[in-house]
């Protein structure tokens, strides 16, 4: 989150305080989520995401599902990567080791040498471009896709009710996977939505009747 605050400030020429970065860890993620996501062609990554649209900026760190063919899906182990998408550069990714004794020591020594040999005054363009016009987007205003892992009552009409609750908040279903029945009368149902407003998806989930289905987990999809 600290790195995201710095990088977003530099990239967007705006003040992006660390305190304004949304942070969510991986404690709610289970092996079941990872397995189902893999079946649907996705991998799970803990991503730091910064986006700018017009005069609004969103910054967030959370577990995210990305498609198997996304460049970031192959970044593993001690490697870190920065994936960029811009109007002129289109798609670009920078990758390298970001952990371990030697990579870390090399980066620290490089910074020390740079500070000792280069004028380290902050570039005035950055200082003066605090971009008072830019505003941070709050959680409820994000727009992304969502992976929903549900446990539903295995009876006629359950799917129709779920679709109705989602559509009532303008949330549409992109793809769905229902697993074979487990012990009891409930079955796992996996839904990936089209892009939706975060406030809308939460409002829709609040309408779910626990007698029909329960939400086991919700993961954002990029």
PLM feature spans:
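Generic structural hydrophobic/aromatic packing signal, biased to beta-strands
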Residues: 37, 44-46, 61, 82-84, ...
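A conserved regulatory-domain signal marking ACT and ACT-like small-molecule sensing domains
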Residues: 112-222
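Substrate-binding/catalytic subdomain of NAD(P)-dependent oxidoreductase enzymes
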Residues: 1-74, 79-81
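Conserved active-site and cofactor/substrate-binding residues in soluble primary-metabolism enzymes
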Residues: 2-3, 24, 28-32, 79, ...
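Catalytic, metal-anchored helix/loop core of enzyme active sites in primary metabolism
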Residues: 51, 57-153, 158
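Short secondary-structure transition/capping segments
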Residues: 35-44, 91-99, 165-174, 217-222
């Amino acid at each position: 989150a600290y790195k995201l605050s710095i990088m977003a400030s530099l990239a967007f020429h705006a003040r992006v305080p660390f305190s304004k970065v949304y942070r969510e860890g991986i404690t709610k993620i289970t092996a079941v989520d990872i397995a189902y996501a893999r079946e649907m062609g996705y991998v799970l990554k803990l991503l730091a995401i910064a986006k700018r649209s017009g005069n609004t900026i969103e910054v967030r760190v959370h577990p995210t599902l990305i498609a198997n063919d996304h460049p970031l899906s192959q970044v593993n182990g001690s490697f870190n990567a920065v994936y960029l998408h811009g109007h002129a550069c289109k798609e670009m990714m920078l990758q390298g080791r970001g952990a371990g004794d030697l990579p870390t020591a090399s980066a620290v020594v490089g910074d020390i040498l740079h500070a000792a040999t280069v004028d380290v005054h902050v570039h005035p363009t950055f200082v003066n471009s605090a971009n008072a016009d830019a505003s941070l987007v709050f959680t409820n205003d994000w727009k992304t896709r969502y992976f929903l892992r549900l446990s539903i009552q295995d009876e006629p009409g359950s799917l129709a009710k779920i679709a109705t609750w989602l559509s009532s908040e303008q949330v549409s279903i992109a793809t769905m996977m229902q697993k074979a029945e487990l012990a009891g009368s409930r079955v796992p149902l996996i839904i990936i939505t089209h892009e939706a407003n975060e406030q809308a998806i939460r409002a829709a989930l609040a309408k779910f009747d626990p007698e029909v289905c329960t939400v086991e987990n919700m993961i954002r999809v990029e």
